[in-house]
Amino acid sequence: MSKFVFNLVYRDKNGEFVDDENVWVRAENKLDALSKVREEYPRASEYILIKSE
């Protein structure tokens, strides 16, 4: 399994930046990692992969 680090961006209804955070998840591949992050953090507006190990 690999470790993937995502930057999650949160925006309000008008699309204005509210907050962001970095989270990591272990997964077999990028698609699996993205699915896991989206499931755990559904309120994020953007999911940006910043690193994989």
Specify the residue positions occupied by each region the protein language model found.
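Short, mixed-charge low-complexity intrinsically disordered segments
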Residues: 39-53
